[in-house]
Amino acid sequence: MNYIVLGRFQPLHNGHVFLIEKALDLAGDDDKVIVAIGSASCQIEPRNPWTGEERKEMIENWNNQVEVVLIDDINDPPNWVEHAKKSHGNGILVTSDKQTAELYRESNWNVIEVDLSNRENFEGWRIRQTAKMLSTVDDFDAVREVLSSSLPSSVIEWLIEKDALFRLSTFQTGVYAG
């Protein structure tokens, strides 16, 4: 059985980590966890500052026990589950997002909904906004300290090593919610 965790992962944060670890617990030793990255081919912009391949690398650096697949966005919600299934295959969706759960249930999928405490602290737009404020800070210990409550250390190191935070400072507008 495949347990599927779906998200944009812009970037992988501790809310995602909690969800993926829950899926790993459910999968045990016999089943597989597939992390499906949505909006994988979107143009780089404030809401999607990292490419699908960059996000895949972040996830694989954090945990190499999961399979990571990329899903191009088709902007067609009624047909999206069938489109996504071509990338992640059949299985059980593990999610904390009510809309995603409903979309998959409408397509006759088994869905396990996981409650996240402090969900508001693990919203991608908040994390991207914080990262943008740190994008020109050269004190990497300070960057690590501020981001450590939201991001796994491996993702923070990836962002620093790849100079991937600086990109956020180049956007003319703020990062978008959602």
Regions from the language model: what does each represent?
Residues 1-178:
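Nucleotidyltransferase catalytic core that binds NTPs
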